[in-house]
Amino acid sequence: MIFIDACFKKPTPYTPIWMMRQAGRYLPEYMEVRKQAGDFLSLCKDYKKASEVSLQPIDILNVDAAIIFSDILVVPLEMGMNLRFEKGEGPIFDNPISTLEDLEKLDDQNAHKKLNYVYNALKLTREKLSQNKALIGFCGSPWTIATYMIEGSGSKNYAKCKKMLYQNPELLHKILNKLTQVLKLYLEEQIKAGANAIQIFDSWASALEYDKFFEFSFSYMLEISNFIKSKYPNIPVILFPKGISGYLDRIDGNFDVFGVDWSTPLDLARDKLSHKYALQGNMEPCRLYDKNAIKEGVEKILKTMQNKAHIFNLGHGILPDIPVENAKYFIKLVQESSAK
């Protein structure tokens, strides 16, 4: 698999590419299946439909890897939190965590066993996927998942989380540790079900100041990565902490690929990290609105990463109103322009 080879810094015939949120609302085919499912969470839980939408970008765009269709918040959901998605508001937990008692109510022993719909979707997708295409499993980082569990929803300033971080750091560490143990088992089950690679999304990494990022986020991501790498050395682990270009000097640990977001200059990440890791990223997602902007972005990134291990991706998820034609153009352009 070209994607897996690139993760391990092996030579590839061209630069492999996939897109975050590639199974998503910009595809009419996705919208049709989502309509049939009823709502977002029902789609996540219907493993046949989740598999179908995971495969759509392979069939429509010819990307080099599929990522399983799911959501990072199914983990706290199956630990016992009440999750719902409100239109225009995103995810909401009706019972956010603010005390040790709240935390102790959550089931960390059986949560990974209740996520069979994810494993079944992975199994089915791997069966249907051609052998040269990789299948990516994923989870959120403990910190990013915890922000939703504590805030009760998305947040602009993470005031509740940060209040806990500074007033009661022991409780926050207990929450993060509990999540970390569940996520290890969850990812292991994903690998057993057919995932060829794992990505850990730390979407809200940049909410933390320098030292606190390494204490409350990165250390837990590394604990998960160390667990996976010790048991499954042939499974590449991708870490994607978003928005921490100022923290790259201290990025070190046992993982394979560093995901670069679009706000981080790729040459900076290359100079600091490419001797240790393959890099993934990092085109500005809004460039996909315009073919000239796509061409310019692709050329610049391929030039920056010339002769370095690289997986092409956007620097964040594809937006819902991107024309499919532009997404197809982007994928083909990367594969053809980078062909050795």
UniProtKB/Swiss-Prot annotation:
InterPro entries: UROD/MetE-like_sf (IPR038071), Uroporphyrinogen_deCO2ase_HemE (IPR006361), Uroporphyrinogen_deCOase (IPR000257). It is an enzyme of class 4 (lyase). Pathway: Porphyrin-containing compound metabolism; protoporphyrin-IX biosynthesis; coproporphyrinogen-III from 5-aminolevulinate: step 4/4. Substrate binds at residues 21-25, 71, 148, 203, 316. Gene3D superfamilies: 3.20.20.210. One of its GO terms (molecular function) is uroporphyrinogen decarboxylase activity. GO terms for biological process: protoporphyrinogen IX biosynthetic process from glutamate. The record marks 71 as: Transition state stabilizer. Its EC number is 4.1.1.37. GO terms for cellular component: cytosol. It catalyses: uroporphyrinogen III + 4 H(+) = coproporphyrinogen III + 4 CO2. It is found in: Cytoplasm. Homodimer. Belongs to the uroporphyrinogen decarboxylase family. Catalyzes the decarboxylation of four acetate groups of uroporphyrinogen-III to yield coproporphyrinogen-III. This is Uroporphyrinogen decarboxylase. It comes from Campylobacter jejuni subsp. doylei (strain ATCC BAA-1458 / RM4099 / 269.97). The gene is hemE.
